[in-house]
């Protein structure tokens, strides 16, 4: 079975889409375009994709040319719409493709990367493919894809969060230091108790002489020795 036949069967749910020429007139073209989301290929148009801000979503397109003449894929764009009121929320940046020529009865693939950065809400993504045929550029809309977009959860070990924590910690420590230097020192000086000077035990126990002191030949003061004791010593020396 030819590869183009497989892709045609895969896109059988997509009817022949309406192409819009740059002249503003409307016509029907026999070009089938479908895509899958490479990160979640199991999702269909009836499912809701879940994306986080900061994600990069890759759409892989399959273009089947059922026209009688050759077509050329030259670009891709798209829109995020409000699925409730169908209002356009934002347009995707137009990306250049190829150009890639697609002969009659053949099919080609190409990718489009989309950076998700929207207010958390529900959206419908509708891509558009630019096709050149017979000197005209035709814009062919693809099927819509419902998606729920949320903000990415911030990890405690995220380098940006760690840096912010360090900045806050250093700032807080700096404020405490400045506050202590300006007010803290003066406050603690005013409330701190005054320490009494300690007197050594040796100085406290030593007697203070009230009169003149005499020193004996032995080298010590004899004023405090009882007189009877001194007489006994002299008597012993005479004997």
UniProtKB/Swiss-Prot annotation:
Enumerate the residue ranges of region (Disordered). 201-222
Q: Which residues lie on this side of the membrane: Cytoplasmic?
A: 183-239
Q: Name one GO cellular component term.
A: endoplasmic reticulum membrane
Keyword terms of this UniProt record: Endoplasmic reticulum, Membrane, Signal, Transmembrane, Transmembrane helix
Where does the chain cross the membrane?
162-182
Task: Tell me which domain of life the UniProt entry assigns to the organism this sequence originates from.
Answer: Eukaryota
Residues folding into a coiled coil are none
Q: Major location, coarse class? A: endoplasmic reticulum
What does the record say about its membrane topology? Single-pass type I membrane protein
Residue intervals on the Lumenal side: 20-161
Location within or outside the cell: Endoplasmic reticulum membrane
The leader peptide range reads 1-19
Q: Which family does it belong to?
A: Belongs to the IRC22 family.
What does this protein's UniProt record list under function? Answer: Is probably involved in a pathway contributing to genomic integrity.
According to UniProt, the name of this protein is: Increased recombination centers protein 22-1
